[in-house]
């Protein structure tokens, strides 16, 4: 509330500077406690604004809008990496983004230690096919330094008309080497659910353990998972592995729908809490456990974020699934888009996600029940192995190395489910034997 009113007062003060005295009425009628604390700072802002206009060498080239826009960008940039002030042009681009009317490289990015960092490449996209990996740092875009570049500025420079080219310089922390990639932008269409072979066939092995990897949480994620589960159950699945590694997240409603496939209707899934009570919400399961309680493992790593963490945190809290891998990214905040009257907008962090036991996700991440770390070299090799279309481009030595790459986290998950299944089968048998023993004992008395 305070930040929103402060913005209103800022606009009112600017109106006074422009000779529109009516704005001061709103300022003086604002809540008294807010006014008393904000007014001295706004006076200072007004003084600096006029000093820049009067004394800066190129001050005459700057409009009040230029200066206020710059001030608002600076103000929002002090909050967190996910909040941002968007000028009208950028807000228009964001709207195109949500409507899917844009070309891109298919890489999800975050700001990490002031570097534009790849959170995850989306499969079957230009970035993925070129070999961009999670954790790569984008240090240049078309030859221009990306150091200390804002997240939205980077997004704006990376996307564009489908068919156009962009060159990015990527530093790979695991090797310390930088490499240029010339990529052609494309309309991004991604399959959300994939099988062990990066396809959509979902075969079931002799161990009867099903496997589905969710690439991200888009509009069709829940439907595609439903199709996969139907295929696996039709083959006699007895245990299930849900792979959320390197899944950067996506839509909240899809995370809720995914959780709903493994929980009874009405079970709490996630809640949001913010400074404003309007941002508080509670989401519950809207389906039923389609697997009937069969053993379930969720694989996660540091690049599992947002909606992935909601699913993992929920099913861990409710003891419906065991989590295996590495601690997740810790991106558990809600961004609201707040349009402003001149066509600009704020992207503002307004709430945080909480698991059913009220554990905060943001900054903390989800800690696995079974910690199975992988080295940078192992993750790098596994990521290359998953890019089967690029396998032939590797040297003979690299191809031989790829054949020996094992997914230790997936192997451990399979071992754990096998153990759970053996135990589940033995318990009824032991109970049956115990019952017979008691009956014999009774007959001999």
Predicted regions and their residues:
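Extended, small/polar residue-biased N-terminal targeting/export presequences
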Residues: 53-119, 165-167, 171-199, 411-436, ...
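Bacterial N-terminal signal peptides that target proteins for export
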Residues: 2-9
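Conserved functional hotspot residues or short segments at active or partner-binding sites
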Residues: 345, 352-445
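Hydrophobic membrane-insertion alpha-helices, especially the h-region
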Residues: 9-23
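Residue-level signature of catalytic and energy-coupling elements of molecular machines
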Residues: 48, 71, 107, 168, ...
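Cleft-lining beta-strand/loop regions that shape enzyme active-site pockets
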Residues: 22, 31-41, 51-65, 117-121, ...
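Electropositive phosphate-/nucleotide-binding environments in soluble metabolic enzymes
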Residues: 39-42, 46, 65, 69, ...
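Acidic/histidine-rich, surface-exposed loop or edge segments in extracytoplasmic proteins
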Residues: 27-33, 47-56, 392-397
């Amino acid at each position: 509330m305070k930040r929103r009113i402060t913005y209103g007062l800022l606009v009112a003060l600017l109106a006074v500077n422009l000779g529109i005295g009516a704005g001061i009425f709103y300022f003086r009628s604002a809540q008294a406690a807010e006014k008393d604390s904000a007014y001295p700072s706004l006076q200072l802002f007004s003084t600096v604004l006029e000093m820049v206009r009067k004394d800066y060498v190129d001050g005459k080239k700057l409009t009040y809008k230029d200066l206020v826009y710059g001030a608002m960008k600076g103000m929002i940039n002090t909050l967190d990496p996910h909040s941002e002030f968007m000028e009208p042009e950028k807000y228009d681009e964001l709207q195109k983004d949500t409507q899917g009317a844009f070309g891109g490289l298919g890489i999800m990015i975050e700001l990490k230690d002031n570097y534009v960092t790849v959170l995850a490449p989306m499969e079957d996209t230009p970035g993925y096919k070129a070999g961009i990996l999670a954790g790569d740092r984008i240090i240049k875009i078309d030859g221009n330094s990306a150091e200390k570049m804002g997240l939205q500025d980077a997004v704006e420079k990376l996307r564009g008309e489908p068919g156009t080219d962009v060159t990015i310089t990527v530093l790979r922390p695991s090797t310390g080497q930088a490499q240029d990639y010339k990529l052609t932008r494309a309309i991004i269409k991604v399959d959300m659910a994939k099988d062990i072979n990066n396809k959509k066939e979902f075969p079931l092995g002799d161990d009867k353990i099903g496997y589905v990897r969710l690439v991200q949480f888009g509009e069709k994620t829940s439907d595609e998972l439903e199709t996969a589960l139907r295929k696996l159950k039709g083959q006699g699945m007895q245990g299930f592995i849900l792979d959320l590694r390197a899944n950067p997240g996506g839509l909240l409603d899809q995370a809720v729908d995914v959780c709903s496939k493994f929980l009874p209707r009405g079970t709490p899934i996630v809640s949001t809490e913010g400074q404003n009570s309007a941002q508080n919400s509670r989401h519950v399961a809207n389906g039923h456990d389609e697997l009937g309680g069969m053993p379930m493992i969720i694989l996660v790593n540091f690049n599992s974020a947002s909606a992935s963490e909601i699913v993992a945190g929920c099913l861990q809290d409710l003891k419906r699934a065991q989590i295996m891998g590495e601690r997740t990214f810790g991106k558990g905040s809600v961004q609201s888009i707040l349009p402003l009257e001149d066509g600009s907008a704020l992207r503002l962090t307004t709430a945080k996600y909480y698991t059913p036991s009220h554990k905060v996700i943001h900054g903390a991440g989800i800690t696995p029940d079974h910690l199975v770390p992988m080295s940078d070299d192992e993750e790098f090799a596994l990521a290359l192995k998953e890019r089967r279309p690029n396998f032939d481009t590797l040297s003979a030595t690299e191809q031989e190395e790829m054949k020996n790459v094992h997914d230790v986290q997936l192997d451990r998950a399979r071992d754990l489910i096998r153990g759970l299944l053996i135990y589940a089968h033995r318990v009824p048998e032991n109970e049956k034997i115990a019952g017979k023993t008691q009956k014999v004992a009774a007959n001999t008395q």
